[in-house]
Structure formats: C-alpha cells, structure tokens
C-alpha cells in the first residue's frame, strides 16, 4: 500500500467537499492515498456520478415493453424494433473540451458516443450533432465553430458512419461556453447484445484492448465538472486526443469478438478511464477486480498509478472474456493490429485492487464508486429566478409591426439570413451522409430517415431544443423540445419510439440554476409520459457558464422513431406542381422568444408559444393516419421563423413556386401571422382531390385545417396578403450565404 496520505486541502483541490472526504474515510476505514483520492474524485465528479441530478432523473419515465436495457444500466439505451432487432442510441456532451480545444474536443465527443454504441454490440449506422455557439462574427466564436465542425466531420467520416441530422443554434450566451452534443444510433440483434459487466465470473481474466495509454485526458471528468474560467485555457491536457482510424479498427474487432460469443462483458474507457471501467463492470457483476498496471501498454514513460488510473486516452476498452476464449480474443485484436493484453482478473471480494511496481496502490470497494451505489446523491436548493416573471410582462404591442407594405419582403430576407434559420449546407457538406447507403432523408431537413440494412424498415432521428424557449419558460420550453422532436420524427412517416437527452445547464449549486434544471426535468418528463415515450438514458452537463454568465438552459432531446415500411416515407417538401398546401393542427403563433423578435427587434422576451400536449398527440396520430392512406405529398414541422420561413424553405428545397393566401391563418398583426412561431402545426401538401378527406379527418381529431395555397412552376413565392413576391434566386442568396463566411477557406 502506498504510504502517502492526503489532506482535506488535497481533497478540496480535487473537487470534493469536506463531507465527501469524510465519507471516503468512513468507506475505507482510513485516510486515502493520492491514487485513491484521484479515483474517488473522478468517480464522484458530477460527470461520472450525476450526484446533483440523479434524484431528478429518476422522476423521468423509463418504462416501456420495448425496452431491452434500463436507463443508466448500460452504455446506451436499447429498444426492441421487431424482427429480433434492437435500436441502440444515446446522446452525450463534450462541451468544456470543445471550449479549450475545439477540434479534438468535438472529435473525441463523437468517438466516445460511437464506442458507447458498439460496446453494446450494435453497429452504428447514423450520427447526429446538436451545436450551440456564440456569434460567428466574433473571431473566437468563428474559430470555435469552424474547428468543432471539422473535428466532428473528420472523425465521423473516417469511421464511415453517416450523419443523418442535427441542429445549430447561435446566441451570445454560448460565446465562452459552446455546447457540442453528439448522438449515435446503431442496430443489433437481440442475441448479440453485449453488457458492461463481469457477469459474476470469478477468476476470469481482465483485458485492456485497443490503443495505448498516455497522459492525455487526465482529470477530464473533473474538468467537465467545473465552471469554465480564464484558467480553463491551461487545461488542454484534460482534453483527450482521438484517432478515428484506431477507433474504426477497435469497432470492427470489438463487434467481431461480441458476435463470436467470446465475451462476458465489455466496457468503453471513457470518463475516468480504467477507474470507471473497472468499478462499473465490477459493481454490476457484484465482484471485484485485481489489476496490475505494469501490464498496461503505455505510450509514455514514467507514468504512475495516479496517472494510469485517470488517463482518458481514447479508443480503449476493458474486456472480460469467457474462460477458454482468451487466445481467440487476442487473435482477433492482433488481426486488427490492436493491443489485447491481460492486466488482471475478476475477484470475489468486491474490491478494486490496483498494483504497480509490485505494490498495492489502491484498494476500494467497487460499489462505493458508482452511480446508484456509494456515490453521493444530492438535491440542491431551488429559487425561482425573478427574470422569469419579468419576461412574461412583455406584450407584442411594445414593438412596432415593421412588416407592413413592402417591408415584409425585406424582413423575410433578413430572417432567412439569420444564423438560426439559414442554410446548414456549409456544415452538412463537411459530413458524409451517403456512406453506408442508408440515407432516405438526409441532414438539413426536419428529421433524418435512414434505411435499416437487411429490413424494409427505416429509422427516423432528430435532435431538438429551442434554448430561448427554455430560458423564457423552463417547464414549457422543455415540453416544447420533446414535442418538436416528436414532430420532426413523425413528419417523415415514422412513429416516435424513445428519447435520449443531453441536459446542458449552469452551476447546480446556485439555487436559481437548480430551479431551472428542475423545471426542465419536470416539463420533459410530463411530455414524455403523455406521448408514451420512455427516456432511455443520456447525459447531464452542469457548470456551463463563464465569468460573463450562464448559458441558456438547453435540454437537448434526441428522438428515434421507426417506419415499418420505408416505401411510406414522407418528404418535407412537395415535388410536383399543383400540390395543395395547408396547415394542420392548431395555429397559435407567438412572437415571444421568436427568431423575428431577436433578429429584427433585438429582444429575447415574452411568452413562448402555447402548447396543448393532448393536441400534440392527436396531431401525431393524424399525420401517421393520413400517411397510411398515402394521401400526403409532404409534411413539414412549422416552428422556427413561422409560416413565412416554412413557405420560403418549400420553394428553396423543391424549386417550385407557391401562390399563397394566409387568410385562414391571419391574426391582428401581420408580423405575428408571418413570423409568429407555433406549436402543434404541420405544413402538408396533398392532391386537390384529397382536400375534403383531409379536412374531415383533421376535424375528427379535434384539430383545425387551414388551407393556404398551391405549388406552381414559377419558382416564385407569393404571399398575397403580405405583398410578398420573391423569386427563388432572391430567396436563395441570403439563405445560402448566411454561414458561408464562417467556413470559407
């Protein structure tokens, strides 16, 4: 056993509290040494233990007869999709690393979430990303955004995994603290799913496989569990360095070993590295492990036990093979030119014992380290922020309606050029969306749709959150995020299936921040419960703030859906002339929190769009029912930018013209009609012969039918009541150029 002991000051420097340090001493029956303190600090960090969020997360709905893995019990969520197949999916953040080293920070975020998926035995088929950055007109923000996107593209493209969608949201609050949330979805046969456990197999060998271990990423978990500060720039050593080509080899070798039935368990070495993998696998299998660090393949000389246990070097796995299968395991990894080295064995006493240089460096009960075991759990003080009441006093009559007359056209073009509305092509062109030949509906639209190889099914995917909405109304904003993600799935024709979430918030020790977090959890939970969607897992990222202030609360929703027959997909936009257009649902536009209010009037204020969760469910049922009858030519979610932006995008993506009359949608202000944002509204296209049938079905679901126009061959958008008449070319200029300068070489 190491002779050194640590002090309370050491514990505080490691991010632990006085009470936590006392609890560690009670668990061990003594004062920990430096290696043990490092292990506890990483495993009890917010990033690994969810200590300030787990009690709230347990209120989310997590039950479904389709669930194959309980939330939080495996590396990712898994749901039965029929035919003996499961969809495996998860979203995770890499926010702080991206803030200090955007290329590697974003790239390794992609690599980490990929490993979570193929560690379950699933082959990743698509990925998505949800990004939040500050104004790209500022050089630092432009650098962060452009480098992060390149990191995401380079890593994902090298792995050969298609990008099916994602989102980008720009606001000044993300200038010093960008958000990078990466989601991956894979497919696996039920009988080939793997688990992160020792399986209770006492005496089995423990192998480290994949890349060598270096000093990169040490304290990565702790770094992600603190506020960003001026000193954060010096924490580049806490940012992991990725090698996507190594990851590709690791993926193929791991999947081969799983499919050949060689493994008892397998765990990605992500946050906290060997510390996390050994303790989580042991705790789940109700065993311990004895590990000899001298056997670990190192890439750097002179590494000590503290560094080895906390290294977050990428592209590594911890594996427990079945007895008698060890040599076959090694052969597979050698074939892929990867390390597969025995470093220990499974023990019966429940202890993690770490040796180096022939000496015992750490001895800790596995259960004491893990989420749901001995890791601390807190519910923090809450206080409703005063601004939440202040913003609700704002009324639209405080701003002029600047859309009257010829101004409508000018305003529309400004909104089309805004960071949050303009074309994502400069981003999506850096991602390979064609690899794997699975794309049916690609990135840049409402939701992605991808063929599931070997079946007639398709997988719908979406990520959504309007951070302004959750800032203005945490509860309703989170509800809205769930409903919009569901809408973006079902407008492809797919049935929403399950949710993964990435909860990006500020310091939880500040009562106002914890109130916002709690309300977002409550809103998300209520929406998921009513829509019948289980939350299969996800990620919490606290401490997203800088000396300039906190980010807007961003509970990113990752949604998956299944289309049983991929021939029944619905496109976002019509492809023929003479297609009738109508809005289905309940059009209740609001200027509160809208892109129009921010872009044109420079304000973030007001009440967000009204949402009736019952109507949202009925609208989902309606769209899916109409699609079964094959009478829809197109379906598009109506939200950011309002009806004027939706019609503009229809012209831009279809190349057709539209003659529209918004009388059925008209409100007392023209700007509210054109640019007000609404929940529970979908813009659909259909043949004129189906018009009355669709109207009757819509009304039968208790919803409203708003006819607004028809497509033609002119390539011109005409909105009669707004005196708008704009050609494809006029629309295309500002829309396409919005992000071009950010990514110009």
Curated annotation (Swiss-Prot):
Sequence positions that bind Mg(2+) 2: 116, 268
Subcellular location(s) of the protein: Cytoplasm
Pathway named in the protein's UniProt entry: Purine metabolism; IMP biosynthesis via de novo pathway; 5-amino-1-(5-phospho-D-ribosyl)imidazole from N(2)-formyl-N(1)-(5-phospho-D-ribosyl)glycinamide: step 1/2
Keyword GTP-binding: no
UniProt GO cellular component terms: cytoplasm
Disulfide bonds: none
Molecular-function GO terms, alphabetical: ATP binding; magnesium ion binding; phosphoribosylformylglycinamidine synthase activity
Catalytic activity: N(2)-formyl-N(1)-(5-phospho-beta-D-ribosyl)glycinamide + L-glutamine + ATP + H2O = 2-formamido-N(1)-(5-O-phospho-beta-D-ribosyl)acetamidine + L-glutamate + ADP + phosphate + H(+)
Binding residues annotated for ATP, in chain numbering: 50, 90, 501, 538
Residues that, per the record, bind Mg(2+) 1: 92, 539
EC assignment: 6.3.5.3
Group of enzyme by EC: ligase
Catalytic residues as annotated in Swiss-Prot or TrEMBL: 47, 94
Binding site for substrate: 93-96, 115, 240, 312-314, 541
Oligomeric form and interacting partners: Monomer. Part of the FGAM synthase complex composed of 1 PurL, 1 PurQ and 2 PurS subunits.
Family: Belongs to the FGAMS family.
Role, per record: Part of the phosphoribosylformylglycinamidine synthase complex involved in the purines biosynthetic pathway. Catalyzes the ATP-dependent conversion of formylglycinamide ribonucleotide (FGAR) and glutamine to yield formylglycinamidine ribonucleotide (FGAM) and glutamate. The FGAM synthase complex is composed of three subunits. PurQ produces an ammonia molecule by converting glutamine to glutamate. PurL transfers the ammonia molecule to FGAR to form FGAM in an ATP-dependent manner.
Name of protein: Phosphoribosylformylglycinamidine synthase subunit PurL
Organism per entry: Leptospira interrogans serogroup Icterohaemorrhagiae serovar Lai (strain 56601)
